């Protein structure tokens, strides 16, 4: 992923291929997909944070943001391309990860990727890097270097879509949309677009271009107060 941000697509592709062919990680199957979100250290999980009932972010937990009984700030936008695709494609197992909370206090449809272990919405292990992301990294690097990007997308989709038929080619836009479908609610989409020098449009803050200072978060005040060596990021 770092190589993609650095524009070293050949290295990104080589590294991704090494993980795909030489690691013990396996893509989730269609049968497994809806079950893995309440499990720890699953077959795709290359890096994830360990969260427990005693060590968690409480009301700053991702599960609290993705539930109508929490902050309710991560509902799907119902007329946006992602939600429209999921609703229109029931053969895609990823469409089953929509929580209908239209009767909740913060009414809407929410991602079901953070159900909370033992009934506690605070307790979810965020999956930082998983194998499907690596396939998508390989596809993005391949399409930028003239390689066979479609093969990576086909392999991923066969493990997501019942009755899927291979395509012979994909574009960068196809790959970025596949990232939205596969990695929604996993802190990916905005950075994917900025990495490719595209803007993100948010109804609350407007257009955020790839070179906007807000694409890099501020250093927390507590960290700045530790000493004089740290300098706040520009714009804050």
Regions found by a protein language model. Give the residues of each.
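Long, low-complexity, acidic/serine-threonine-proline-glutamine-glycine-rich intrinsically disordered tracts
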Residues: 80-87
């Amino acid at each position: 992923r770092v190589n993609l941000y650095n524009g070293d697509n050949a290295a990104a592709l080589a590294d991704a291929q090494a993980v795909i062919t030489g690691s013990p990680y396996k893509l989730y199957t269609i049968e497994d997909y809806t079950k893995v979100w309440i499990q720890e250290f699953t077959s795709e999980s290359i890096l994830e944070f360990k969260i427990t009932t005693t060590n968690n972010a409480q009301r700053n937990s991702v599960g609290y943001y993705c539930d109508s009984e929490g902050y309710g700030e991560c509902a799907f936008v119902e007329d946006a391309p992602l939600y429209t695709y999921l609703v229109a494609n029931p053969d895609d197992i990823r469409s089953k990860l929509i929580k209908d909370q239209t009767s909740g206090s913060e009414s809407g449809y929410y991602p079901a990727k953070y159900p909370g272990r033992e009934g506690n919405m605070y307790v979810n292990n965020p999956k930082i890097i998983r194998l499907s992301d690596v396939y998508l990294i390989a596809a993005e690097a391949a399409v930028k270097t003239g390689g066979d990007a479609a093969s990576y997308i086909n392999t991923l989709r066969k493990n997501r879509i019942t009755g899927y038929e291979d395509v012979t080619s994909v574009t960068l836009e196809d790959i970025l949309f596949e990232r939205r479908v596969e990695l929604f609610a996993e802190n990916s989409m905005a950075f994917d677009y900025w990495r490719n020098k595209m803007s993100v449009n948010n109804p609350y803050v407007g257009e955020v271009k790839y070179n906007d200072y807000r694409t890099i978060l501020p250093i927390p005040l507590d960290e700045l107060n530790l000493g004089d060596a740290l300098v706040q990021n520009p714009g804050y």
